[in-house]
Amino acid sequence: MKKKFAVIGSILALAPFALATNGDNMIGIGPASRGMGGIGTGMPVGPIDSIFRNPAWMSYFNTKRFFLSFGGILFMPNVKVSSKMFMDFEPRNSGGGGYFQTNGRVKSDADTFIVPEVGIVHKVN
């Protein structure tokens, strides 16, 4: 029972750190799948979609040929954060009265990324 609580506590403690930029909601991985609205999940359109979206489609490439596919995505997130913080110091706790306010706005300068994609499918035996 202690082990379950430790695992659940660890997951809950580490979950906030898993957030990135909300990511790119990938409709499809390769250009063929993205151009057809994410059809790579339901039918094989290439090695990259077979690996990342539906690995069961790797059996479709059931020949002795070597399938290699590569490409990339230009990812341009627009990340902005604004924050307001207000603190009211009680005179009995801080030794004098006070009011503290700060406003913050930040826009990320990292706004363009190239995300490479490589897929290799080859029958092993």
From Swiss-Prot:
Q: Which domain of life is it from?
A: Bacteria
Q: What is this protein called?
A: Uncharacterized protein aq_628
Any signal peptide, and if so, which residues?
1-20
Task: Give UniProt keywords alphabetically.
Answer: Signal
